[in-house]
């Protein structure tokens, strides 16, 4: 028989119910703090910082990231809440608080059921079937984004109700297109402004995270940078040493876009970057085969560089005969783990226009749908421009907080464009819960599977319930009143305390946000409820400092060494 707790070699292990209840306590405490931010009348949370004034926020994922408990088992639960919030934020840009509320509800109810003898595996099967029905219902409720007004509404909600930021994002999408590149940078005034500049995007990010210059945003930013574009691998540091020496002498950064960079050269570049001797970043070339070479030619023309290593060009990386003319320039390069944005390339505008016209001609004459699509992608990247939102504010803290909100709003707005919008305010999940009534009556379900369905049915009603509670009203009463109305677009406007058509009132969520929130929450809760053991590190025991050592007073003279 397993014991309920055991200690082995600096670790503590808890088993079964005790392990799950310890984690559940941490989950509940963490979600209690996160849930207070949900909805238009959600409350602020004040977070102590390691330096400076406390941070005041209404962003669920920021609250989740700040929570850490002294008890390691409770902390494990809190970290799993943080994990689900982070994942939802990364995939959808919004819905983090909804995810937290859902994971706490599913986990808590499942533990109560397991304690009364419910089989967790069968219960999970029931949950999975319920989630499938929920996702189908959300898809059926979804509407396509048809206007800039819809985009502004989604962006405003995701930016915590900031209408100015929502309007700017709507304008940016209108100018560069729904698939266009929108980026942010620090402004030089108190106001936030929009500017469209010449730019190009590449669907590849940095080769190594060691190139990152902004640890918080996990991106590398190079200002007024040289650009080296190579169709071949950079296999040895010696082949690019003259280029590195050249950029070091000028004091400017270097962006290398190459077929690949092998470990020896990469290690040397990273070492020098970390030592502060070199400002550099490396990106793998986008595309495959002939399309890769063509895209590298596009990049070279945009930056005013010469494509080295191209077959038949006779232009190679040569340590003996380096010509600075092979390097192009960009005013700014922003590189994340997934993509790269180049602004204001040094290429001649006449050559860029000529390249654009060439691509248009190729598109017109192309018969293959696949090839035409690739050509259209290249054309969009070369000619679409980049919308830059210059974020203003009274302090660096204010600017950074605004940039975080814009990043989230951009992510959720793109999600809305791709997968459509659904009624907001928790209504989409609330309506989806009614679709589970027929599943509960399915005779093929076992009793334990039916329990799993019921747990999901209760959980998906909780986000709307929490929004109402945060607005100071009775959650259960409002939820039932919404469900009694047969019009699936009707919900509760917590800001104005009235029942409205959610689409007409502009209270909408991207369908992807709702989909990701329920999927991630149930996935993490299912893993926790089926856990049979939890292992944490024991706190290290402090070794008491040695007191005065009798008879050793003569060693006091060693103090002269300091």
Swiss-Prot record:
GO CC term, one of those recorded: mitochondrial matrix
Keyword Chaperone: yes
Effect of mutating residue 249 to G: In strain: PBOL
Organism superkingdom: Eukaryota
InterPro entries in the record: Chaperonin_Cpn60_CS, Cpn60/GroEL, Cpn60/GroEL/TCP-1, GroEL-like_apical_dom_sf, GROEL-like_equatorial_sf, TCP-1-like_intermed_sf
Impact noted for substituting residue 538 to F: In strain: PBOL
Range annotated as the organelle transit peptide: 1-8
Keyword annotations from UniProtKB, A to Z: ATP-binding, Chaperone, Mitochondrion, Nucleotide-binding, Stress response, Transit peptide
GO aspect biological process, one term: protein refolding
GO molecular function terms listed in the Swiss-Prot or TrEMBL record: ATP binding; ATP-dependent protein folding chaperone
Subcellular location: Mitochondrion matrix
Effect of residue 521 to P: In strain: PBOL
Keyword Nucleotide-binding found: yes
Induction or repression: By heat shock. There are multiple isoforms that, with increasing temperature, shift in relative abundance from the more basic to the more acidic.
HAMAP family in the cross-refs: CH60 (MF_00600)
Any further remark recorded for this protein: Exists in at least five isoforms that are not related by a simple post-translational modification and may represent the products of different genes.
Family: Belongs to the chaperonin (HSP60) family.
Function: Implicated in mitochondrial protein import and macromolecular assembly. May facilitate the correct folding of imported proteins. May also prevent misfolding and promote the refolding and proper assembly of unfolded polypeptides generated under stress conditions in the mitochondrial matrix.
Name under which the protein is recorded: Chaperonin HSP60, mitochondrial
Organism of provenance: Trypanosoma cruzi
């Amino acid at each position: 028989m397993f014991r309920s707790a055991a200690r082995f070699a600096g670790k503590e292990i808890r088993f079964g119910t005790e392990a799950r209840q310890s984690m559940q306590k941490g989950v509940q405490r963490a979600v209690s703090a996160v849930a207070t931010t949900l909805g238009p009348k959600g409350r602020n949370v004040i977070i102590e910082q390691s330096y400076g004034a406390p941070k005041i926020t209404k962003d669920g994922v920021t609250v989740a990231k700040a929570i850490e408990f002294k008890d390691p088992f409770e902390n494990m639960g809190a970290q799993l809440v943080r994990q689900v919030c982070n994942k939802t934020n990364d995939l959808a840009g919004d819905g983090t608080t909804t995810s937290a509320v859902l994971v706490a509800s599913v986990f808590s109810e499942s533990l109560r059921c397991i304690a009364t003898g419910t089989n967790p595996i069968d219960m999970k099967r029931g949950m999975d079937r319920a989630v499938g029905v929920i996702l189908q219902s959300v898809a059926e409720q979804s509407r396509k984004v048809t206007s800039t007004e819809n985009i502004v509404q989604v962006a405003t909600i995701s930016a915590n109700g900031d209408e100015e930021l929502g309007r700017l994002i709507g304008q940016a999408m209108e100018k560069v297109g729904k698939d266009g590149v929108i980026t942010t940078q620090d402004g030089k005034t108190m106001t936030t402004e929009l500017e469209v500049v010449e730019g190009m995007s590449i669907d590849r990010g940095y080769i190594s995270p060691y190139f990152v210059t902004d640890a918080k945003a996990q991106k590398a930013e190079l200002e007024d940078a040289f650009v080296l574009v190579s169709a071949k691998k950079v296999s040895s540091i010696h082949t690019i040493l003259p280029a590195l020496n050249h950029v070091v002498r000028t004091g400017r950064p270097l962006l290398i876009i190459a077929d690949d960079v092998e470990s020896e050269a990469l290690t040397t570049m990273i070492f020098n970057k970390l030592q502060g001797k070199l400002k550099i970043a490396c990106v793998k070339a986008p595309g495959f085969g002939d399309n890769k070479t063509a895209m590298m030619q596009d990049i070279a023309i945009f930056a005013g560089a010469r494509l080295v290593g191209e077959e038949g060009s006779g232009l190679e990386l040569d340590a003996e005969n380096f010509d600075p003319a092979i390097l192009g320039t960009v005013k700014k390069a922003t590189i994340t783990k997934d993509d790269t944005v180049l602004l204001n390339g040094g290429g001649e505008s006449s050559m860029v226009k000529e390249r654009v016209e060439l691509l248009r001609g190729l598109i017109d004459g192309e018969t293959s749908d696949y090839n035409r699509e690739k050509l259209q992608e290249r054309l969009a990247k070369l000619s679409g421009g980049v919308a830059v939102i210059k974020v203003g504010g009274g302090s660096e803290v204010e600017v950074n907080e605004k940039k975080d909100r814009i990043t989230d709003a951009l992510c959720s707005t793109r999600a809305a464009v791709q997968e459509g919008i659904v009624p907001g305010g928790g209504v989409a999940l609330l309506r989806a819960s009614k679709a589970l009534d027929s599943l509960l009556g399915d005779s093929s379900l076992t009793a334990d599977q039916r329990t799993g369905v019921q747990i999901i049915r209760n959980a998906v009603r909780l986000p709307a319930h929490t929004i109402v509670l945060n607005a100071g009203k009775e959650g259960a009463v409002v939820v039932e009143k919404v469900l009694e109305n047969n019009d699936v677009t009707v919900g509760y406007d917590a800001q104005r305390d009235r029942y409205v058509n959610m689409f007409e009132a502009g209270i909408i969520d991207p369908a992807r946000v709702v989909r990701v929130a329920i999927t991630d929450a149930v996935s993490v809760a299912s893993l926790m409820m089926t856990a049979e053991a939890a292992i944490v590190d024991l706190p290290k025991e402090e070794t008491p400092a040695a007191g005065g050592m009798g008879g050793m007073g003569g060693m006091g003279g060693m103090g002269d060494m300091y």
